[in-house]
């Protein structure tokens, strides 16, 4: 069954690019047409690239890899945190700190500092060993660290791959990933450079619904990879009891079983070749989201 349907892409406004005056000529091959001054992305190509990225992420996680979810723009923050947490992966959704990958040892020390501050009882001044002023300063430090590093608190080494929403905004993350040869999976809007991304997904990186859908697809790929990893580990442990699953892993297994009939129903929807231009729902999305964000 397909990872996502054409109708889902249309309803989420994935096909809306930027205004024609704001584009990267390298993206020409991914553009279907132009409508009312806005480029329309070829969703047939998007479907193929989604499948390719999905299989890569799934295989990476199945072999023990980790996916770092990155998206600091307002439209992506909630989806990045929600979907990465759902599958137990690290994320950055507020600010990318320079050297987060290339200087990971220093970042790891800051994470350890954050965990040490979390052990302090800020409500009990007497037993804390600090004055009220010191506790206030330490609390501020903790709040700042949690905002910047809270999403990667359990990241013990550089990730195996990175999922990025808006490659232009997250150019620092792209640069660091390239230096370390970390594969990048990302949404490519019509103003992006496809040469910067290893596994591109042509689509709208500004509309909230588009970002939510594509980020969920990547999280689903992670979930399948985790299930495959666990199945492989269980199968290789002959004669021994299977290691208990974490609570969130059990939920993934249960949801994958219960959602299968729904997914099959969605898969039955016939793709519409020219719907990227003619669908009324898509045109409404253009008015409400694309024009405001582009």
Curated annotation (Swiss-Prot):
Chain segments annotated as transmembrane: none
GO molecular function: structural constituent of ribosome
Family statement: Belongs to the universal ribosomal protein uS2 family.
Gene3D superfamilies: Glucose-6-phosphate isomerase like protein, domain 1, Helix hairpin bin
Leader peptide range in chain numbering: none
The protein's name in its UniProt record: Small ribosomal subunit protein uS2
UniProt cross-references to HAMAP family, sorted A to Z: Ribosomal_uS2_B
GO cellular component: cytosolic small ribosomal subunit
PROSITE patterns given in the database record: RIBOSOMAL_S2_1
Alphabetically ordered keywords of this record: Ribonucleoprotein, Ribosomal protein
PANTHER family referenced in this protein's UniProt entry, alphabetically: 30S RIBOSOMAL PROTEIN S2 PROKARYOTIC AND ORGANELLAR, SMALL RIBOSOMAL SUBUNIT PROTEIN US2M
Protein source organism: Renibacterium salmoninarum (strain ATCC 33209 / DSM 20767 / JCM 11484 / NBRC 15589 / NCIMB 2235)
Superkingdom of the organism of origin: Bacteria
GO BP, one annotated term: translation
Segments of skewed composition (Basic and acidic residues): 283-294
Amino acid composition bias (Low complexity), ranges on this chain: 259-282
InterPro entries registered for this protein in UniProt: Ribosomal_uS2, Ribosomal_uS2_bac/mit/plastid, Ribosomal_uS2_CS, Ribosomal_uS2_flav_dom_sf
Tagged with keyword Ribonucleoprotein: yes
Residues covered by region (Disordered): 254-294
């Amino acid at each position: 069954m397909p990872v996502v349907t054409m109708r889902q892409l249309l309803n989420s406004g994935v096909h809306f690019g930027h205004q024609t005056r704001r584009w990267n000529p390298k993206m020409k091959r991914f553009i279907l047409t132009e409508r009312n001054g806005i480029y329309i992305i070829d969703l047939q190509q998007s479907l193929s690239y989604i499948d390719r990225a999905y299989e890569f992420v799934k295989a990476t996680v199945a072999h023990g890899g980790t996916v770092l979810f990155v998206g600091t723009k307002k439209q992506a923050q909630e989806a990045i945190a929600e979907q990465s947490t759902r599958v137990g992966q690290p994320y950055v959704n507020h600010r990318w700190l320079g050297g987060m990958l290339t200087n990971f040892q220093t970042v790891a020390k800051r994470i350890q500092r954050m965990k040490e501050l979390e052990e302090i009882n800020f409500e009990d001044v007497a037993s804390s060993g600090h004055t009220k002023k010191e506790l206030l300063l330490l609390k501020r430090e903790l709040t700042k660290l949690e905002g910047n590093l809270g999403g990667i608190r359990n990241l013990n080494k550089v990730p195996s791959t990175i999922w990025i929403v808006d490659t232009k905004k997250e150019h620092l993350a792209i640069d660091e990933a390239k230096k370390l040869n970390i594969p990048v999976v990302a949404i490519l809007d019509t103003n992006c450079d496809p040469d910067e991304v290893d596994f591109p997904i042509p689509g709208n990186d500004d509309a909230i619904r588009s970002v939510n859908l594509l980020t969920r697809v990547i999280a689903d790929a992670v979930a399948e990879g985790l299930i495959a990893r666990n199945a492989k580990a269980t199968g290789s442990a002959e004669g021994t009891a299977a290691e208990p699953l974490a609570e969130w892993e059990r939920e993934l297994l249960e949801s994958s079983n219960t959602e299968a009939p729904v997914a099959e129903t969605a898969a039955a929807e016939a793709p519409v070749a020219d719907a990227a231009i003619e669908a009324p729902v898509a045109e409404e999305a253009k008015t409400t989201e694309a024009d405001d964000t582009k």
